[in-house]
Amino acid sequence: MKSFASLLFLAATAAAHATWQQIWVNGVDGGTSCLRRAANNNPIDVGAKELACNAHTLSPNVCTIKPGDKVTVEMHAQHGDRSCAQEAIGGNHYGPVMVYMAKVDDARTADANAADWFKVSEMGMASNNPVYWAVQVLNDNCGHWTFTVPDLAPGNYLIRSEVIALHVAGSIGGAQFYPGCFQVNVVGNGSGRPTETVKFPGAYKATDPGVLFDMYRPQSTYIIPGPRPYGTSPATVANTPYPTTATWNTALQPTTVPTVTPPVGGGTNPPPVTTVAPPVVTSQPPVPPTTQQPPVVTPTAPPSGPLQTQYGQCGGQGWNGPTQCQPPYTCTASNQWYHQCL
């Protein structure tokens, strides 16, 4: 029989839902055209081979970028849902946001586990007065995270974006990893070849200070896992309130994925863009339903007071917010400080 603590951990893991889904280049929406699609939106273990990209399906395309471009990667809780009504990664899954890149021969077929990854963007604890995390900044901006492409030699690369959720990271194995990858071709006259690289898995250990971390104890700093970023300064922790105003124009956020892909390329010989005919869907005629009496439903009184949404916090030591959940969710304890609607 599983222990109560292990059941709480499994409940917290099951509640975590988010994947990286879209890419933008200088404000142009590239959608999922060069995304390595994830099999599902569950977190990845620190030692799993899926930690590299969490990829189930590779893309036949690469998106073209160059040094100095502003690249935005986009995360959402459910696949295909680009609305800002729901947090990109909810349930107070606070922690760092990082972006890595790796030079490869052909981004369309490259083995992400064999790649040499260098970091190009990071943010951990944005402020300690009050504590404000990179994930909160991500959520403020409807799941959009923007970085500048550093000086890089031309060629194919993989982009790896990542969230580490620390809400149950106070014990070994509690940190939850949400990576995702995009396939790109860097053009231009750059010459940079980063040398401080890591492998995934292998870049992090379960006992690293930024992986094994109790976010419910008073903390004034946070050590971001992984190497120092290339082409930009390491992130710092502010001791003044972090601005919560979105820098991304959420009012212009599209609700669908674009049907026209951005320019593609594959090294020296760009691959042809092929048009795939829509699948032919066949179905059997519906079987008439059998007649039966409807079940007798006994109405229940709706819960009173303010209700928390799915994955939102609903209890825990020091919590003063809603303690009841919107139907059909129930308030479930992850630990003594954090309960959420599952």
From Swiss-Prot:
Modified residues (Phosphothreonine): 19, 57
Keyword check for Oxidoreductase: yes
Residue ranges with Pro residues bias: 285-302
Function according to Swiss-Prot or TrEMBL: Lytic polysaccharide monooxygenase (LPMO) that depolymerizes crystalline and amorphous polysaccharides via the oxidation of scissile alpha- or beta-(1-4)-glycosidic bonds, yielding C1 oxidation products. Catalysis by LPMOs requires the reduction of the active-site copper from Cu(II) to Cu(I) by a reducing agent and H(2)O(2) or O(2) as a cosubstrate.
Gene label: AA9-X282
Native source species: Coprinopsis cinerea (strain Okayama-7 / 130 / ATCC MYA-4618 / FGSC 9003)
BP GO terms, sorted: cellulose catabolic process
The protein's name: AA9 family lytic polysaccharide monooxygenase AA9-X282
List of residues binding O2: 167, 176
Disulfide-linked positions: 63-181
A single GO molecular function term of this UniProt record: cellulose binding
